[in-house]
Amino acid sequence: MAEYASELFTTGQARNLFIYGKPGTGKTLCAKYLLDQIRKHQKASEIPVLAIYVNAGKTRTPYYTMAEIMRQAGTEVPCAGWQMFRLKRSFEQLLENKSVVIAIDEVDAIIFKEKDPLVYYLNRQPKTTLILISNNVDDVVRLPERALSTLQPVLMYAESYTAEEIRTILKERVEHAFKPGTISDKLLTTIAKTVCEVGDVRFGFRVLLSAALLAEKARRQRIEADDVMSAVEEESRARKIKELEDLRDRLHELKKKRERD
């Protein structure tokens, strides 16, 4: 990270990054930390750098992703009326006096929605550095060859947490959110082992919340084993439904891409 920031503030532009790994492994946290460091260092630097984070999973389309980028850059973008070319023109004017680092989370949500991907356009611009975040490294290698030849991202793999690391994370969350004694260390360890199998620490947060709500509904002050088991089952069902919905959306986007090509 230090090397990355040094490169950015020395030249005004750094190598593109592609952060990938399973859901809930800290990819977003890593990118946001880097952006925070850039904002802190930029105050002491002679090179003005704007750090922007956008979640393409929420913006969903290249247009709304670009619109959100410009809003975070300080441009007042109306909800309707602007076309993509106007957003791009405003972005190019922005680059006349500053560098920009853009982190695009869940980039797979927009990367195949047009023949000329937005990330390809952004990468062609001077003084622009991209941090792309996805659950799948295949998303970057499936970019058009001309985009890959210029993008040339540094790949950063976010490794899954160990059971002990997950337990520590969950314990910190419990200490901040629950009253002392609400859940035993034994049950916390059980949840951590389950989360380790799933590979997504956010699953553990949802299990804790669901288990706490079940205990509250039963008018109990402590979370019991049955609460945890029910919460795991409930959140596992919700997770499978979400995975199926994501797969359906992905297949739909691939079908649309083939039709365009």
What is the predicted function of each stretch?
Residues M1-T10:
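Pre-Walker A adenine-sensing motif
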